[in-house]
Amino acid sequence: MRSLAIALAATTVAASGALAQQQGVTKDEIVIGTIQDLSGPIAAFGKQTRGGMVLRVDEINEQGGINGRKIKLLVEDAAYDPKRAVLAAQKLVNQDKIFMMLAHIGTAPNLAAMPVQFEKNIVNFMPVTAAREMYEPFHRLKYSFAVPYYDQMRVMLPRLVKEKSAKKVCTIYQDDEFGLEVMRGAEAGLKTLNMELAEKTTYKRGATDFSSQVARMKAGNCDLVVLGTIIRETIGTIGESRKTGFNPTFLGSSATYTDLIHKLGGPAMNGLYASMGTQHPYLDEASQPIRFWANKYKTKFNEDPTVFSAYGYVIVDAFARAATKAGATLTTDSFIKAMDTMVIPTDMFGSAEATYGPKKRLGSDSSRLSQIQDGKWKVISDYATP
């Protein structure tokens, strides 16, 4: 009996020791971190992502937390700057001792911060960027939710080409890794139709004049234009086109799927298509659950939610599902084990079902199409996969 008691005591000590060694987890708290842009070029997106995260964290804590533990969310501002992202990651990982990094925004900041996290066995959970590097090459500490720009175009462009009977497909894209991913996806999609891009035009990040690119595409008789653009360049390109009487079909990636396009660009933006998954939460949305959620968000933060608010919300929700499934002894290993058989069902925003596995780190590769109609984004297609 005595030896059994000693063995049990040793087991208890070992178990509590393992728990004590797990950074960011105590008996009544889980500390998570996020790096956002709160003062840089995409600060609007960063603030909205943070808002969605805060809303879901507060709801979970009000309901008693995760297996009895409350969530503590720490937010750092890196202003969309990779150098600042490294410093923010070092602070969160080494000083604040977070358990996990969630919803870090932007491709370059994530690429800069991940080595800091991985050195300390900290998962990079569902960053807010659609870059393939968020799940490739495989790493056990990477989890991604955003369908890559490449796959979005590869799937959606052929559908639209057929629907519009387009003969000449052209592109304007940002002269960097983001723009190239959109362009390469367009090329891959056209290849399935035995077509090629008839005209390729580029612009440097920060450009404000797109007249020469539009003139070139107009002269080339392009009837469908793929936009490797974000906000200002999308509005600038379409605005210039309308002004010159050039009215092709415009298709953007999920980077153009934001209410800022129609809010800032006005009626000229009507007709724009974008690939997307998670639906923009309008306050007067026909869907009652989205409408209720959007008004709850507005009441809490005194501003309208956006699709980025929805991203923040669903990412924290997915984390909570996996952490709950991991059980009372929450460690990086138990979390990964829970994710290995994880199925995240579709949500009120219509996001595609996501599945993860031992070697599967992208939840879903399905996209659908939305179009700006009467000054609002409207979902117009079902999901499609590569």
Which residue ranges define each predicted feature?
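Extracellular/periplasmic periplasmic-binding protein-like sensory domains
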Residues: 238-313, 325, 379-385
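Beta-alpha junction/loop-to-helix N-cap segments that form part of ligand/metal-binding clefts
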Residues: 29-31, 44-51, 59, 63-135, ...
